[in-house]
Amino acid sequence: MDDKQLQAQAAFSKASQPAIDASLNLRFSFLFSHPYANLQHFIIFFLGHRPDHPGKLYLVTDNRCRA
């Protein structure tokens, strides 16, 4: 990959990040407002949308999210 391709990929990632964040916020707000979100303990695997965003494991307890 040459320098121009890397710059274009970085610009695309930076430009798309607010949309990805908004999508995740909407997804998690729906999940935590759902009646079954009051389970004592459960684990959510979130797979990353981009190669430089590899994914995270969230442990959710009492509707609080800890990374």
From Swiss-Prot:
It comes from the Bacteria. Induction: Expressed approximately equally in exponential and stationary phases (at protein level). It holds the Pfam family YmgM. This is Protein YmgM. It comes from Escherichia coli (strain K12). The gene is ymgM.
